[in-house]
A protein has these predicted regions:
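A short, surface-exposed beta-strand/turn
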Residues: 45-69
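A mature extracytoplasmic/lumenal domain signature
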Residues: 16, 42, 51-53, 92, ...
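Short, non-transmembrane alpha-helical segments in secretory-pathway proteins
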Residues: 1-16, 73-78
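Exposed beta-strand-loop-beta-strand "reactive/processing" segments of non-cytosolic proteins
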Residues: 8-51
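Metal-dependent nuclease catalytic core centered on acidic motifs
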Residues: 60-186
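Intrinsically disordered, low-complexity segments enriched in small/polar residues
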Residues: 13, 23, 31, 55-57, ...
Length: 187
């Protein structure tokens, strides 16, 4: 945790041995490992960290760690931001970050979507673990998954690494997506 979140301190709430840890690729799914419940002393966000068994690009398998801190923090900040049009996206079961989901049917215009996404991005980037260029952000991104009446359209990155994301860049990206997918918003 110190490697990925160097500006924070954590405490172990509980730990347990688990059988059949999460695995990926052709790796065996009958390995055992450990799961810990952790709390951040800085954000008071509670999350889990656990062993997983992953396939490498070389056909070998290895133990790794999975934590859902960024996702748990995003869930808290979505609730604090208090806009029901934004929700957590949990489509990727082994993700080292959190993503958000919006549906275009909940908005009146592309400008409104862009403004809400940009304001939320500004809000969560002012909080731990998203302040500054944290090491974990360089390995992952925070994406907004955009839907149109429950049909997936595409996703856009809200992460500032490796480029700066502005209100204008979000607006341009959403406009292009909607033109490409022939999506119009209600008047």
């Amino acid at each position: 945790l110190k490697e990925y979140y160097p500006n924070e301190s954590f405490e172990i709430v509980s730990g347990e041995k688990i059988d059949n840890i999460k695995s990926s690729g052709s790796c065996s799914d009958n390995k055992s490992g450990y799961r810990y419940t952790i709390v951040s002393n800085d954000t008071n966000v509670q999350f889990t960290i656990e062993d997983i068994y992953e396939a490498s690009g070389y056909g070998t398998c290895y133990y790794s760690l999975y934590d859902n801190y960024a996702q748990a923090a995003l869930e808290k900040y979505i609730a604090d931001f208090n806009d029901s049009r934004i929700s957590i996206y949990t489509g990727d079961p082994i993700s080292f970050h959190g993503d958000i989901k919006i549906d275009s049917k909940d908005f009146k215009s592309i400008d409104e979507i862009s403004s809400v996404l940009y304001n939320f991005k500004t809000y969560y980037e002012s909080k731990q673990p998203f302040i500054g260029e944290q090491p974990f952000i360089k390995e992952s991104s925070i994406d907004a998954f955009i839907w149109n009446s429950e049909n997936f359209v595409s996703s856009i990155s809200l992460s500032y690494f490796p480029r700066e994301i502005t209100l204008d860049s979000i607006n341009q990206e959403i406009t292009s997506l909607f033109v490409e997918h022939n999506i119009t918003l209600p008047a």
